[in-house]
């Protein structure tokens, strides 16, 4: 004979931790899923990010994420945007953004000595991928097809080599050849010698 044990189903107000160790609180019930599961909204204590319509199982197991937690090199975060796991412009721009962050803030990155160690930074707005994603589409030279085919890439040196910050005023999309010539020549040759 199976016993029917009632669990406390009201988790509103309870605090939990996600799989990254970040604390969040269940703020309210948000209705039901198509399958009939109770849905809840949760708010992260540190960032204030609200993750909506989460199932109890996701909450209790910690399988939710704070999209405003600085998980990329300890300084950058995704923001409220979805990055598909397939070849698409969102994924390619995410890889471009992540590599830019690594060059400037991760001492373990091969190119850190040419960027972060020399004082190159990323503007505050671009520490959020969502902001970078929308700004990148408005930069001079932007062309989705050429980005996907790896014919053009993001550059901050051609406009003015003395500028030490990635932002929408200093960056543009240029061909790989343009980026490797002149300003990029020394950096590229140094990188190739390390390989």
Predicted features and spans:
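Short helix-coil boundary/hinge micro-motifs
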Residues: 1-53, 68-98
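Short, intrinsically disordered low-complexity segments
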Residues: 1, 53-55, 179, 191
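Short, structured interface segments
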Residues: 58-71, 76, 171-182
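Acidic Ser/Thr/Pro-rich low-complexity disordered segments
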Residues: 50-53, 109-113
């Amino acid at each position: 004979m199976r016993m029917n044990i009632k669990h406390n189903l009201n988790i509103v107000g309870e605090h939990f931790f996600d799989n990254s160790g970040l604390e969040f609180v269940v703020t309210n019930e948000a209705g039901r899923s198509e399958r009939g599961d109770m849905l809840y909204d949760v708010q992260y204590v540190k960032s204030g990010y609200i993750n909506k319509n989460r199932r109890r199982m996701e909450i209790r197991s910690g399988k939710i994420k704070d999209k405003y937690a600085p998980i990329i090199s300890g300084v950058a975060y995704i923001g409220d945007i979805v990055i598909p796991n397939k070849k698409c412009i969102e994924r390619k721009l995410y890889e471009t953004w992540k590599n830019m962050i690594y060059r400037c803030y991760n001492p373990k990155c091969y190119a850190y000595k040419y960027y972060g160690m020399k004082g190159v930074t990323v503007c505050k707005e671009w520490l959020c991928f969502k902001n970078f994603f929308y700004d990148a589409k408005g930069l001079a030279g932007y062309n989705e097809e050429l980005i996907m085919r790896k014919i053009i890439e993001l550059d901050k040196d051609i406009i003015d080599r003395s500028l030490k910050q990635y932002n929408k005023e200093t960056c543009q999309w240029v061909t790989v050849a343009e980026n490797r010539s002149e300003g990029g020549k020394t950096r590229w040759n140094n990188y190739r010698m390390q390989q």
